[in-house]
């Protein structure tokens, strides 16, 4: 669906440039691959602030000294006294709030986070960035958490609805495909008469379609006297 010779950063920048200016405070939510100076500045030019995950090898400047985020977290994690215990969607995390410079970003908030039961574990360390420094720690994490349903939607569409399996060149074609894909997703969630998870609905509909195929083949077999006549009916 896109020219693979063009970088993802360039694609996201082009998308950002086409967005209308938001009428209210709005945020670009992203994973760590898109937290770059170019993308942040492009969205900022359109009126969007950025909230995203951050790689733990990014450089921070705490107290004016250059330090890799993961190394800074190790120094802080000797005790949890510098961390606040925060609850997001019923899950608790120890969070340290840094505000200051990053490479390519003059001023932003960076949150260093550990799950409550994995404090100080380097493998459990997660970091998040917000270019809106006026947001509280809870607000940043709550906004970022809104990304997950969107992420799950796209993953479901890629795995089950062939989102990444088509090459469509026209804008009208893309809009039509998007409409059909969204309708198919909705049918999986609500098409059985009651709301259910996408996975359950998808498997239920798949089973119904498969049973209809078997029923059709069975009817063809009943109406046939030999293999050749069966093939004529079934194919």
Question: Where in this protein do the model-derived segments appear?
Answer:
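Single, function-defining residue in the core of a domain
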Residues: 1-235
């Amino acid at each position: 669906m896109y020219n693979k010779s063009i970088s993802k950063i360039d694609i996201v920048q082009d998308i950002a440039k086409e967005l209308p200016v938001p009428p209210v405070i709005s945020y670009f939510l992203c994973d760590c691959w898109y937290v770059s100076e170019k993308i942040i500045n492009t969205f900022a030019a359109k009126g969007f602030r950025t909230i995203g995950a951050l790689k733990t090898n990014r450089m921070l400047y705490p107290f004016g000294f250059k330090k890799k985020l993961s190394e800074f977290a190790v120094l802080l994690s000797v005790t949890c006294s510098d961390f606040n215990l925060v609850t997001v969607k019923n899950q608790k995390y120890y969070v340290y709030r840094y505000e200051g410079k990053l490479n390519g970003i003059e001023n932003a908030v960076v949150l260093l986070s550990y799950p409550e039961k994995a404090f100080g574990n380097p493998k459990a360390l997660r970091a998040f960035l917000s270019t809106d420094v006026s947001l509280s720690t809870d607000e940043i994490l709550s906004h970022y958490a809104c990304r997950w349903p969107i992420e799950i939607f796209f993953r479901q569409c890629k795995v089950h609805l062939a989102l990444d399996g088509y090459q469509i060149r026209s804008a009208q074609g893309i809009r039509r495909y998007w409409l059909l894909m969204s309708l198919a997703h909705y049918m999986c969630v609500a098409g059985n008469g009651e709301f259910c998870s996408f996975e359950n609905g998808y498997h239920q509909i798949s089973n119904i379609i498969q049973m209809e195929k078997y029923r059709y083949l069975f009817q063809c077999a009943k109406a046939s006297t030999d293999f050749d006549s069966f093939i004529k009916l079934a194919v």
